[in-house]
Curated annotation (Swiss-Prot):
Protein name stated in the entry: Acetylglutamate kinase
Gene transcribed to yield this protein: argB
HAMAP family in alphabetical order: ArgB (MF_00082)
Top-level taxonomic group: Bacteria
Localization, UniProt: Cytoplasm
Residues in coiled coil: none
Annotated EC: 2.7.2.8
Enzyme superclass (EC): transferase
Length: 296
């Protein structure tokens, strides 16, 4: 390493110092999904970032998705999968595959990668200790001058309650929870949107940060420029102006709910960027779009 590179790295370490102190002992919830879960280099850098947070005294909690992996397994098993309004209709056969993939292969791969990076990760689904209590979530479509249409999505659920004691026990012992977004009502098993689970966990724990990894830079304005920061109170305009649409709508709704439940800051950031988590947390500029409450 030449002297200039060494000097640059030393400056980066010094820049991170106040943030390391600020986040010491704090809970940070990360939603892990998209391209960051597919690319080999990004998977490795994600695991290293999570391990680093843990090793410097921060408490990361990871909630992961797995839609493409579920789709691949359903195809291999010749199980047809139906989508309504972007949501997977989850019958009994599909739910068995969803649970097998999310709580099994995907979850354990992430656990193994974080462990290899030098930390201690533990894989969970919401059925462990019934810590994610859920209920059935049917889709209600409303059309002008017509009665609402209720669409049965099968075992698609929504979060009712997060039992935090299991998570606190793990992080206090230095473990990193890696969570598959599967919930239960103690009778049925439910497939839940991973963004919703991450937001609910962050809110229940009053996390310092909720970070959502996506396949875009963050929220873009109508000129396709990154919105670096927005107040919670100004988010309705993002919907009314058509700035957020499609899959970004439920993502932003989860962000809003998390802040309303006590999360200090939510950031939507680009998971395609290597070590984007560290760049967001430990640099002056940060990356992505941050959402915070207006100061009183």
């Amino acid at each position: 390493m030449d002297m200039e590179k060494a000097r640059l790295r030393s400056h980066m370490l010094i820049e991170s110092l106040p943030y390391l102190q600020k986040f010491q002992g704090k809970v940070i919830v990360i939603k892990y999904g998209g391209h960051a879960m597919k690319d080999t280099l990004l998977k490795q850098s994600f695991a290293q970032s999570i391990a680093l947070l843990n090793l410097v005294g921060i408490h990361p909690i990871v909630v992961h998705g797995g839609g493409p992996q579920i789709g691949n397994m359903l195809s291999r098993l010749n199980i047809q999968s139906e989508f309504r309004e972007g949501l997977r209709v989850t019958d009994k056969a599909t739910m068995d595959v969803v649970e097998m993939v999310l709580a099994g292969s995907v979850n354990k791969e992430i656990v193994n990668q974080v462990n290899q990076a030098g930390a201690k990760a533990v894989g969970l689904s919401g059925k462990d200790g019934a810590f994610i209590l859920a209920e059935k979530n049917d889709l209600i479509l409303t059309k002008e001058n017509q009665p609402p249409e209720i669409i049965n999505l099968g075992n698609v659920g929504r979060v009712v309650h997060i039992e935090t004691s299991l998570l606190y026990t793990l992080i206090e012992k230095g473990f990193i929870p890696i969570i598959a977004p599967v919930g239960t009502d103690n009778k049925q098993t439910y497939n839940i949107n991973a963004d919703e689970v991450a937001g609910a966990i962050a809110g229940a724990l009053k996390a310092t940060r909720l970070l959502l990894l996506t396949d875009v830079e963050g929220i873009l304005d109508l000129n396709k420029k990154l919105i670096q920061s927005i107040y919670l109170e100004d988010t309705p305009k993002l919907f009314s102006d058509g700035i957020v649409f499609g899959g970004m709508i439920p993502k932003l709704q989860c962000c809003i709910e998390a802040i309303e439940q006590g999360v200090e800051k939510v950031v939507i950031l680009d998971g395609r960027l290597e070590h984007s988590i560290l760049l967001e947390l430990f640099t002056d500029q940060g990356v992505g779009t941050e959402i915070v409450k207006k100061p009183v």
